[in-house]
Amino acid sequence: MIFDKGNVEDFDKELWDAIHAEEERQEHHIELIASENMVSKAVMAAQGSVLTNKYAEGYPGNRYYGGTECVDIVETLAIERAKKLFGAAFANVQAHSGSQANAAAYMALIEAGDTVLGMDLAAGGHLTHGSPVNFSGKTYHFVGYSVDTDTEMLNYEAILEQAKAVQPKLIVAGASAYSRSIDFEKFRAIADHVGAYLMVDMAHIAGLVAAGVHPSPVPYAHIVTSTTHKTLRGPRGGLILTNDEALAKKINSAVFPGLQGGPLEHVIAAKAVAFKEALDPAFKDYAQAIIDNTAAMAAVFAQDDRFRLISGGTDNHVFLVDVTKVIANGKLAQNLLDEVNITLNKNAIPFETLSPFKTSGIRIGCAAITSRGMGVKESQTIARLIIKALVNHDQETILEEVRQEVRQLTDAFPLYKK
């Protein structure tokens, strides 16, 4: 019987080897991809539970199948914890991803072809904020706003003037590669001025918002979307919040039956665990440590004139660095750092001149190293290791030194092998 095959290592050695290799990679590499984090064993246990067996189309108390009394408890726990965590009146925890959450929010607020003002991808926005290759850009008429050419920060007066000119039905705030705090109150004022809805995608900063170390968009946005991983440190999934009951009903209809069928109740259970973890007072210390570590790491680059820190600093978990003075492009930098077991990604910088497949910059985030227990000292050390590798990218002896120093750090701060 299939139930006898409970051990992946024995039943599927080929798959187990790949999983084990990834476990070793995470254990011994320094993870700086800003959209990644390290979940707790409790989150993984919930996601790997028998809840994966249960189909539950609909919502708690109103399902299309029987036998849902247990998953109703699970999903209700996730909903109530999300509401408490973010101070929202309504929460939908069924969205499979941040992209699904954004799609549902758009469906709830606007019609196909409507004009939307969103952050341009090159300035730090996300694919779902209107990229022409994404459903958002194909379905709606997106107009992109950028950052100031001098400060590389959002210019709210310029965004207001742009909103007046294009008269959007919806304004989208939020980013995937913007290192500064966003003034959601100003965005709401702009939206109100032109009679538009305001949607905030807080996927990257959700954990910081939950901990109260970053301003919350919930009091200002008509709808807030998020992922549940990244700084929130939960499973991969989506979340939608609102304080408007009428919009909550539209959101629920957009998620199911509009975009999805049965919810992933095992993932929702893992979300519930992550929300409980984030409600613990210790999570605020964790979130503040992310900000402290990111600032410390960014400062090392700011003090080295061979690199240019985009916008001059960071207020959150992420920052961008122009690396073209020391290496041809961000892609080469990413590949080189992979070789010394430091993982990050190439990233376009504002007013990029290179192709998106090469880029001038790299994006660095500190959520994952903070989850390992690393602090300001280690963050500064990692920055110096990155600089050492990039500046000496053709010196194998020096690159080997960096590999050894990386291994010393990861051994000192084990992930799951404790």
UniProtKB/Swiss-Prot annotation:
Subcellular location, principal: cytoplasm
GO cellular-component term (any): cytosol
Top enzyme class: transferase
Cofactor or coenzyme needed: pyridoxal 5'-phosphate
Parts of the chain that traverse the membrane: none
InterPro entries: PyrdxlP-dep_Trfase, PyrdxlP-dep_Trfase_major, PyrdxlP-dep_Trfase_small, Ser_HO-MeTrfase, Ser_HO-MeTrfase-like, Ser_HO-MeTrfase_PLP_BS, SHMT-like_dom
Its EC number(s): 2.1.2.1
Localization, UniProt: Cytoplasm
Gene Ontology MF: a single term: glycine hydroxymethyltransferase activity
Keyword hit for tRNA processing: no
A GO biological-process term: tetrahydrofolate interconversion
Site (described: Plays an important role in substrate specificity): 229
Residue sites binding (6S)-5,6,7,8-tetrahydrofolate per the record: 121, 125-127, 355-357
Keywords: Amino-acid biosynthesis, Cytoplasm, One-carbon metabolism, Pyridoxal phosphate, Transferase
Pfam families per record: SHMT
Metabolic or biological pathway: One-carbon metabolism; tetrahydrofolate interconversion; Amino-acid biosynthesis; glycine biosynthesis; glycine from L-serine: step 1/1
Modification sites for N6-(pyridoxal phosphate)lysine: 230
Catalytic activity: (6R)-5,10-methylene-5,6,7,8-tetrahydrofolate + glycine + H2O = (6S)-5,6,7,8-tetrahydrofolate + L-serine
NCBIfam families: PRK00011.1
Family named by the database record: Belongs to the SHMT family.
Role: Catalyzes the reversible interconversion of serine and glycine with tetrahydrofolate (THF) serving as the one-carbon carrier. This reaction serves as the major source of one-carbon groups required for the biosynthesis of purines, thymidylate, methionine, and other important biomolecules. Also exhibits THF-independent aldolase activity toward beta-hydroxyamino acids, producing glycine and aldehydes, via a retro-aldol mechanism.
Protein name (database record): Serine hydroxymethyltransferase
Source species: Streptococcus pyogenes serotype M1
